Structure formats: structure tokens, C-alpha cells
Design a protein with these regions (language model features):
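Catalytic domains of carbohydrate-active enzymes, especially glycoside hydrolases
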Residues: 49-72, 161-163
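Short, acidic/polar
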Residues: 44-56, 144-161, 210, 305-314
Length: 355
């Protein structure tokens, strides 16, 4: 267990890989320009020219970078998974090309993100469950603390190994529910205190259905304005973003007690259906065998959907859009729309109107 959590060889790390990360200049006029940010959600770090140009052209100053997932393995043990690899491994590239694609762009604030599968906070018959010590059950009092320690240590190790400096915040992404809330919140409370000792804040993602629940014990939240419908239903035309699904959840955003920023979707899905039944989301051509009678449908938010979401958030609580985050910085995603369309998302204040 300890060896796996501390084993960083699978990351293909390069010493002194990154240039120094510097925070946004203190001289920037934050009163007139909102924070422009994006998620980087992949298992391999590659900063090609299209991503670099997008970052520079749209003045993106903050990247939320997925570092690794946390899952239960076949034996029920909680383990890190799908750790981000920073070295480019394309054998067709020269050493110089690999280095350039591995470098972190200058002037970016990096926020490491860890996705934790909700099952990690549920009881498990094969091992001690992650469970709040308030339950009074034996053998689990320190389990949330152990998980918090392991996650923070792994983040710090990855930062150090890759020369990622000046990290001021870390983030946890988890689709927690009422049944896991107590254990998850205790874990967050411990992690927040540990991060504070390292002079870092803690943020967490907030899904729409979680808005009606007690806010998590973190410094701030990121409201996920996507995955709003049921992708498994062929009749659901807008599973990524449909404001008809969103509207009931955001009516009381003005009184939500946790500071929020909002993340908006750029991505699309290719969804496979067989005889009207959901088979899966196709990420690569080898994911599923496709029969002649199968249906492959593309689900994607249009610019009108994204702008409606931005305006709706403005109407409910304009402060949330003081930081606009795009999900995510993928080559296909950043080519979906025209440059001026992305600017419309970022320049929401000048394009907002009452709805």
C-alpha cells in the first residue's frame, strides 16, 4: 500500500522538467477583468502549439491540472490510478520536440486536481471502509486522515519532481452523495488543515445536485455546469448541458454560503447505442465493437447553450463568473468554435443580459 502510493516511477518524471511557475502579476487589474482559466484533464501532459497559442491568445492565467484518480482496486484497497505522465513518449518526435511539449507554459498558476471515486467513501466488506470516526466504529478512526495524508504527500511529490512551484491551491473532485457526505467531509476537513500547513488552500468541485446539500468544508468550490442530463437515454439530446435541467438547481445561488467559480463545457461525446440501449461513450475507435445496426450519436453543447448558461449564472450571482473556467484544454475542444466565440465566454460581463 505505502509502496504504491509513493511509487512515482510510472509518471515518467524528468528532473527539472518544468520552467518556474509564476503567479499572475499583482499589477493586473482584477477589478475590470475576470480570471480566465481552464482544466487540463488527461493522463499525459502535452503542451503542443495549438494549446500554447490558445492559452496565450485568450490570456489564460490558471490551469486546473488533473494529477491522478483515487479508486478501489479489485481487493477493495484504495489506490492512486491513471497518474498524469509528464514526459512525451512519441517515438517520432525529436528530443527537442518532446522537451518543448513537456514544458509548463510560463505565467500560469497550476492547481493540482485529484478525482476520487465516490465508492472510496462507502463501506467495503473486503477492507476497512473510509468512514467518519463520528460513527464510533472500530478500526476506521484514522482512515480519512490516512487518505488525506497520502493524497497530499503524493501531490507534493509530483510538484517537487516536476519543478511545479508556487502552488497555492489543490482541488478534490468527487461525486459525493448523502450516504458518503459524513466521511467525505471529514476527509476534506483534515486535508484542508494539512494543506493550510503548507500554505495552500483547498477547493472542491460542486455538481448541480449537490447545491441543495450542505456545502463541503473547503475554501471555495467550482460549480460544474456540465453533465446535466442522462447520456444513457437516446431521447436525451443535450446530456452535457441543457439549461432546462440546470434551471431548477441554480435558483438559490445568490444565497449559497460557499464562494464559487463556474466551469463550462467545450467537450463532445460520441455515444454508442444498440437497439436503443446505451452501450458506452466512444473515446477511441477500439473502445467497442460496432455492429452495422448500431447507432453512434454525437452529443455536444453549442455556443448558444454555453452562453445561455453563462448569462444564467450572471443573473443568479455575477460574482461566480469572476472566474470563468473552460473544460477542458483539449486540442479538439479548443478548435470547436471561432476565437471570437471563446472571447464571448470570457467577456461575459459585457455580453450579459437579464433573462
Amino acid at each position: 500500500m505505502r509502496r504504491i502510493w509513493n511509487d512515482l516511477t510510472s509518471m515518467r518524471l524528468l528532473p527539472a522538467l518544468f520552467t518556474c511557475i509564476c503567479l499572475i502579476s499583482c499589477s493586473q487589474d482584477t477589478t475590470t477583468e475576470n480570471q480566465r482559466s481552464a482544466y487540463y484533464w488527461s493522463t499525459t501532459w502535452q503542451m503542443d502549439s495549438s494549446k500554447m497559442n490558445f492559452i496565450q491568445k485568450h490570456h489564460i492565467k490558471r490551469l486546473y491540472v488533473r494529477f491522478f484518480d483515487v479508486v478501489r482496486d479489485a481487493d477493495g484497497e484504495i489506490m492512486p490510478n491513471a497518474t498524469l505522465q509528464f514526459e512525451t513518449t512519441d517515438e517520432n518526435m525529436t528530443a527537442e520536440e518532446k522537451k518543448s511539449k513537456s514544458l509548463m507554459p510560463k505565467g500560469l498558476e497550476i492547481i493540482p486536481v485529484v478525482y476520487i471515486v465516490n465508492d472510496c467513501f462507502k463501506a467495503n466488506t473486503k477492507t476497512n471502509p473510509i468512514r467518519s470516526n463520528k460513527s464510533g466504529r472500530k478500526s476506521s478512526d484514522e482512515t480519512p486522515r490516512q487518505l488525506a495524508d497520502k493524497i497530499l504527500n503524493r501531490i507534493l511529490q509530483m510538484n517537487e519532481a516536476n519543478d511545479i512551484e508556487n502552488v497555492k491551491e489543490i482541488q478534490i473532485d468527487c461525486d459525493w452523495t448523502a450516504s458518503t457526505q459524513e466521511a467525505y467531509f471529514e476527509f476534506l476537513h483534515i486535508l484542508k488543515e494539512n494543506a493550510k500547513d503548507k500554505k495552500m488552500q483547498l477547493s472542491a468541485t460542486i455538481r448541480l445536485h449537490q447545491l441543495s446539500m450542505t456545502p463541503p468544508p473547503v475554501d471555495r468550490g467550482i460549480l460544474m455546469m456540465y453533465n446535466t442530463g442522462d447520456v444513457k437515454q437516446l431521447s436525451c439530446q443535450k446530456p452535457i448541458l441543457d439549461m432546462k435541467d440546470v434551471a431548477p438547481y441554480i435558483q438559490h445561488l445568490g444565497s449559497y454560503p460557499l464562494p464559487l467559480s463556474a466551469a463550462y463545457p467545450l467537450f463532445s461525446w460520441r455515444v454508442l447505442f444498440r437497439e436503443g440501449k446505451f452501450i458506452g461513450i466512444i473515446h477511441t475507435d477500439d473502445d467497442f465493437p460496432v455492429l452495422p445496426s448500431d447507432s453512434i450519436v454525437v452529443r455536444k453543447p453549442e455556443m448558444s447553450d454555453i452562453m445561455e448558461a453563462v448569462r444564467s449564472i450572471n443573473y443568479q450571482n455575477e460574482d461566480i463568473n469572476s472566474e470563468v473556467i473552460l473544460f477542458d484544454l483539449n486540442t479538439d475542444n479548443i478548435k470547436r468554435f471561432k476565437s471570437e466565440d471563446y472571447e464571448k465566454i470570457f467577456n461575459h460581463r459585457s455580453n450579459s443580459s437579464s433573462i
